[in-house]
């Protein structure tokens, strides 16, 4: 559960309505793989990840980034039940994929950076603070199965 004020929730929802999930998802996942290269080990089947340009232009990275942000969108629609919303993904990432749950926090922080880049001055410090709460809540929900 994420504790947002009514104003924060409205601002988060309003901005998210402007997000191009295809573009932002691919960029966020791509940046995660470039900035934290050890995360690439979970994506060995994606082909060429040998350079930042290769990562950022990789169609499988873009497609999976879109999928990730689709799940994030579901989370935004269920902020009062993030653990329930992400229960299956938490189980998959823990039991089958063995993803270090710290990676969820890293991806959330990268997503906030990408949103700031895309929205510039519209992404105010107050909106950033609200999004940090959301990505922390999502990361916590995804890590729930690990506890």
UniProtKB/Swiss-Prot annotation:
Organism of derivation: Ateles geoffroyi
PANTHER family reported in the protein's UniProt record: HEMOGLOBIN FAMILY MEMBER, HEMOGLOBIN SUBUNIT BETA
Lineage: Eukaryota, Metazoa, Chordata, Craniata, Vertebrata
Subunit text: Heterotetramer of two alpha chains and two beta chains.
Name of the encoding gene: HBB
Protein name (record): Hemoglobin subunit beta
PROSITE patterns (UniProt xref): GLOBIN
Modification Phosphothreonine, positions: 13
Chain positions with S-nitrosocysteine modification: 94
GO biological process: hydrogen peroxide catabolic process
Occurrences of domain Globin (ranges): 3-147
Keywords: Acetylation, Heme, Iron, Metal-binding, Oxygen transport, Phosphoprotein, S-nitrosylation, Transport
